[in-house]
Amino acid sequence: MSNKKGQSPKEESIAKMLICKVHIGTKNLENKMKRYVYTRAKDGVHIINLAKTYEKLQLAARIIVAISNPADVVVVSARPFGSRAVLKFAQYTGAQAIAGRWTPGMLTNQIIQKFTEPRLLIVTDPRTDAQSVKESAYANIPVIALCDSDSPLEHVDIAIPCNNKGKESIALMYWLLAQEVLYLKGVIPRSEPWNVMVDMFLWRDPEQFELKNLANEENTPTAPHLIENQYAAEAPYDEWTKKEEWNDNTNEDWKNPIAAEEW
C-alpha cells in the first residue's frame, strides 16, 4: 500500500518521524545503543537510524498481536509527556495503561490491591520506568521499551530506538505502534489510512488551556446594547421617586431661628 505521493508505508512513517524529531538522540551514548546510531552531529548529539527504528516498531507490533488477550499487555509511562499517549494506545488496542507513578510491587507483591500479572510490558523510558522494568525481570515478563541513545538496555527484550523525551516523538511512536497493531489484527484495512490523528496522542498542559481560556474571556468584547438593556431593566427605587419626602415633609424646626434664651 502506498499513499497518493507514491511513498511506501516505510517511507511515509520515516517522513513523519523526521517531522516529530524521532531521530534526535542525546549527547550521551550507551554502549549497547551504538548499533542504532547513524552518526553524531557537530554539537555532539547522536542521530538515530530511523530505518532500524521502523524495523523494531514492526517487530514490537507483531509481538503485541501474538498475545491473544489485549488486556494482558500493560503499557507504562512515568514521564508526563507520555501519559496521554499510553492512555490513547490502551484505548485503541485494549491494553492496560499505567500513567504516572508506578506502585512498587505491582508485579511481585501479591498482597497489594494493584497486583497484576501481564504477559507483556511496554515502557516509555527504561530509566524513568526502571522500577517496572526491574519487577518484570523478577516475574519473567518480556519488556518492550522506547530507548534513547543513553537508555540502559538491562532487562529490555525489544528496544525501539527513538527520542523518548520529546512529547511529539512519544506521541508519534505510540500512534505508529497502535496503527500497526490494528493493521495486523484486521481492525482497519491497510488500503485506508487510520482516521485518528497523531494530535490525539499528544500531551497537553492543562495550565496552558486555563490561561488560554482566561485570555479569551478577557478579550471577548461586550455588546453595547446589552449594557444599555442591563441598566434599563433595573427598576427605580420607590423612595427616590417620592417627592414629598424632600419637599413636603421638611422639618419646620429648622426654618425658625433659635431664640437667644435657649443658648
Swiss-Prot record:
GO terms for cellular component: cytosolic small ribosomal subunit. Keywords: Cytoplasm, Ribonucleoprotein, Ribosomal protein. Its main location: cytoplasm. It is found in: Cytoplasm. InterPro entries: Ribosomal_uS2, Ribosomal_uS2_CS, Ribosomal_uS2_euk, Ribosomal_uS2_euk/arc, Ribosomal_uS2_flav_dom_sf. The keyword Coiled coil does not apply. GO terms for biological process: cytoplasmic translation; ribosomal small subunit assembly; translation. GO terms for molecular function: structural constituent of ribosome. The keyword Cytoplasm applies. It comes from the Eukaryota. PROSITE patterns: RIBOSOMAL_S2_1, RIBOSOMAL_S2_2. PANTHER family: 40S RIBOSOMAL PROTEIN SA. Component of the ribosome, a large ribonucleoprotein complex responsible for the synthesis of proteins in the cell. The small ribosomal subunit (SSU) binds messenger RNAs (mRNAs) and translates the encoded message by selecting cognate aminoacyl-transfer RNA (tRNA) molecules. The large subunit (LSU) contains the ribosomal catalytic site termed the peptidyl transferase center (PTC), which catalyzes the formation of peptide bonds, thereby polymerizing the amino acids delivered by tRNAs into a polypeptide chain. Belongs to the universal ribosomal protein uS2 family. Component of the small ribosomal subunit. Mature ribosomes consist of a small (40S) and a large (60S) subunit. The 40S subunit contains about 32 different proteins and 1 molecule of RNA (18S). The 60S subunit contains about 42 different proteins and 3 molecules of RNA (28S, 5.8S and 5S). This is Small ribosomal subunit protein uS2. It comes from Plasmodium falciparum (isolate 3D7).
